[in-house]
């Protein structure tokens, strides 16, 4: 069933434009609060956010919704998404909320929901919430003497800082490392530099002056040029780029080269396999991860299990099949020994541990495999279902037959934007470029005709 509000990572859209309005945010609070208002205990919700201008508006709306449903609201302020997931569990809350649009520009915002176990909600639970949103919610309001209380909670940043520090192996210190970190003017602008400094590193920070409108603006994991310049300028050993809510990370090595999530997963998998920490004899990634990663793992007797795009689906597969490492090429790295969702800072600490233990440079540690040529392009759509068109389906089948075992083809609608994503990879770069361009042309022609 097609969902009206929830995409692959919660509800997301332009702020003050449906569905990302304060009215809907309040209704989500009432609906979600109703579903998680089970048992006779006093029910609680934690609400965090990143640094977007619209975050204050949506935070107030969600507090109103949850308290109207009878839940006490613990307001955390700007804090990373993985911290919200952690605090949902440690504060014994019934539900957790992160108000963020992750790596998107400040004009957008979103709502991510976590269950009492700290994991993102399942499709079924999101469907229940959507079903309630279509109904009259007045019947779900708490009685006057059961309305929830709201309060801002102090000290939660320190809890997350200590949690992150504990994920670095005890035999490792960051002393002697000069680290440049880009906090994307986002949720981790205070906690991430503090963690690195307290672990002994010399820290140079950029992207730590949020003003409500500069989150992810020419900074962070989706725009690492500023970090590359800073690494060169200060001669840093490593650069760490987080995104707006700090659930993803990209590394810059000492030469200024980008290290993506696939390479980071390879480093962690190999390191954890050597220390016998790795479970499942492999890792979980999505269909977008490079074929080179799959070959790298296979050569070392490890498996790569693939899921649909979205870190929540990676996590679901990890839980079902007892893996403890998973992630996405974009830098969502999930380490279930330490958390229930992607955590850019914790993932970076595992890379730093590998660097310190080996005594090698970041470029030597993080270049684990040669990626096969991969090309990803997007086609913007305004409606219709071009992937159901006969011409498009034939073009896809022809391309898959041509690639055969020498490459892969992934074509899918974006779960967060009105786009069709076309990705192909294989050993022959010219062939890949031709296939992608032909498919883009076919999809565009169908879209135009529609």
From Swiss-Prot:
Catalysed reactions, semicolon-separated: alpha-D-glucosamine 1-phosphate = D-glucosamine 6-phosphate
Alphabetic keyword roster: Isomerase, Magnesium, Metal-binding, Phosphoprotein
Gene Ontology molecular function: any one: phosphoglucosamine mutase activity
Requisite cofactors: Mg(2+)
Function: Catalyzes the conversion of glucosamine-6-phosphate to glucosamine-1-phosphate.
InterPro entries: A-D-PHexomutase_a/b/a-I, A-D-PHexomutase_a/b/a-I/II/III, A-D-PHexomutase_a/b/a-II, A-D-PHexomutase_a/b/a-III, A-D-PHexomutase_C, A-D-PHexomutase_C_sf, A-D-PHexomutase_CS, Alpha-D-phosphohexomutase_SF
Protein family according to the UniProt entry: Belongs to the phosphohexose mutase family.
Residues engaged in binding Mg(2+): 102, 243, 245, 247
Metal-binding is among the record's keywords: yes
GO BP terms in the entry: carbohydrate metabolic process; peptidoglycan biosynthetic process; UDP-N-acetylglucosamine biosynthetic process
EC top class named in words: isomerase
Residue numbers carrying Phosphoserine: 102
PTM summary: Activated by phosphorylation.
Any one cellular-component term (Gene Ontology): cytosol
Enzyme Commission designation: 5.4.2.10
PANTHER family noted in UniProt: PHOSPHOGLUCOMUTASE (ALPHA-D-GLUCOSE-1,6-BISPHOSPHATE-DEPENDENT) (PTHR42946:SF1), PHOSPHOHEXOSE MUTASE (PTHR42946)
Protein name: Phosphoglucosamine mutase
Cofactor notes: Binds 1 Mg(2+) ion per subunit.
Catalytic-site annotation from UniProt: 102
Entry keyword Magnesium: yes
């Amino acid at each position: 069933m097609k969902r009206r509000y929830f995409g692959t990572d919660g509800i997301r859209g332009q702020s003050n434009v449906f569905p990302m309005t304060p009215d809907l945010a309040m209704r989500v609070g009432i609906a979600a609060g109703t579903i998680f208002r089970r048992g006779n205990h006093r029910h609680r919700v934690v609400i965090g956010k990143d640094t977007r201008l619209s975050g204050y508006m949506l935070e107030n709306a969600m507090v109103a919704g949850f308290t109207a449903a009878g839940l006490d609201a613990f307001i955390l302020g700007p804090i990373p998404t993985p911290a919200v997931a952690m605090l949902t569990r440690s504060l014994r809350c019934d539900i957790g909320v992160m108000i963020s649009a992750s790596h998107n520009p400040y004009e957008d915002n979103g709502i991510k929901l976590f269950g009492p176990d700290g994991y993102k909600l399942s499709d079924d639970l999101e469907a229940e919430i959507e079903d309630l949103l279509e109904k009259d919610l007045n019947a779900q309001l708490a009685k006057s003497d059961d309305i929830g209380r709201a309060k801002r909670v102090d000290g939660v940043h320190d809890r997350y800082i200590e949690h992150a520090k504990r994920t670095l192996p005890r035999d490792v210190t960051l002393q002697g490392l000069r680290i440049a970190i880009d906090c994307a003017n986002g949720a981790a602008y205070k906690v991430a530099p503090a963690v690195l400094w307290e672990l002994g590193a010399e820290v140079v920070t950029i992207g730590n002056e949020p003003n409500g409108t500069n989150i992810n603006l020419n900074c962070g994991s989706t725009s690492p040029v500023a970090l590359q310049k800073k690494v060169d300028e200060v001669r840093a050993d490593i650069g760490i780029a987080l995104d707006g809510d700090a659930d993803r990370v990209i590394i810059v090595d000492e030469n200024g080269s980008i290290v993506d999530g696939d390479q980071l997963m390879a480093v962690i998998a190999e390191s954890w396999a050597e220390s016998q920490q790795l479970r499942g004899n492999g890792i979980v990634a999505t269909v977008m991860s490079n074929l080179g990663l799959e070959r790298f793992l296979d050569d070392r007797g490890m498996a790569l299990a693939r899921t649909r795009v979205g870190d929540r689906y990676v996590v679901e597969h990890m839980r079902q099949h007892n893996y403890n490492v998973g992630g996405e090429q974009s830098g969502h790295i999930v380490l279930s020994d330490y958390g229930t969702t992607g955590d850019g800072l914790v993932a970076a600490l595992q890379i730093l541990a590998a660097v310190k233990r080996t005594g090698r440079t970041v470029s030597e540690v993080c270049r684990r495999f040669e990626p096969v040529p991969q090309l990803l392009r997007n086609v913007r759509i305004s409606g219709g279902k071009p992937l159901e068109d006969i011409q498009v389906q034939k073009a896809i089948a022809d391309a898959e037959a041509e690639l055969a075992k020498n490459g892969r083809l992934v074509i899918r609608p974006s779960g967060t934007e009105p786009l069709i994503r076309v990705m192909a990879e294989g050993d022959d770069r010219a062939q890949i470029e031709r296939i992608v361009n032909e498919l883009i042309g076919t999809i565009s022609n169908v879209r135009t005709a529609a």
